């Protein structure tokens, strides 16, 4: 199985339905024996430029390990979901489990 990093920008009005939406995507990944190595909810953030007249989006990152057919099903599901403003799927060489730079910066802001 291959490793991937997935970043989603979700419509800010859909933050309430986020758990159900991500549960559906988790099911697609784990259906064929895939694993989620890291999941981070970056929360609502300012966009660099407006997308569909929106200035904020809810960001989510997860690192997964799954077969190619599960990834194709996941990408198709993401493509046809109107709540997903942007998506990025990158193949990685290995599972990444340490906190991302975004999460580290969030921890510094809280302190």
From Swiss-Prot:
Keywords, in A-Z order: Ribonucleoprotein, Ribosomal protein, RNA-binding, rRNA-binding
Top-level taxon of the source organism: Bacteria
Role this protein plays: Binds together with bS18 to 16S ribosomal RNA.
One Pfam family, short name: Ribosomal_S6
Single GO MF descriptor: small ribosomal subunit rRNA binding
UniProt xrefs under NCBIfam families: S6
Annotated protein name in UniProt: Small ribosomal subunit protein bS6
One GO term of the biological process aspect: translation
PANTHER family: MITOCHONDRIAL 28S RIBOSOMAL PROTEIN S6, SMALL RIBOSOMAL SUBUNIT PROTEIN BS6M
Record family assignment: Belongs to the bacterial ribosomal protein bS6 family.
HAMAP family: Ribosomal_bS6 (MF_00360)
GO cellular component: cytosolic small ribosomal subunit
Name of the gene encoding the protein in the UniProt record: rpsF
């Amino acid at each position: 199985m291959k490793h991937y990093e997935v970043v989603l920008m979700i419509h800010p009005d859909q933050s309430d339905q986020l758990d159900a939406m991500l549960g559906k995507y988790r099911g697609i990944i784990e259906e064929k024996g895939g694993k989620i190595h890291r999941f981070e909810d970056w929360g609502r953030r300012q966009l660099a430029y407006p997308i569909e007249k929106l200035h904020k989006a809810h960001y989510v990152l997860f690192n997964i390990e799954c077969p190619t057919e599960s990834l194709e099903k996941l990408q198709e599901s993401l493509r046809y979901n109107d709540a997903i403003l942007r998506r990025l799927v990158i193949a990685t060489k290995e599972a990444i489990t340490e906190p991302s730079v975004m999460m580290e910066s969030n921890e510094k802001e809280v302190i």
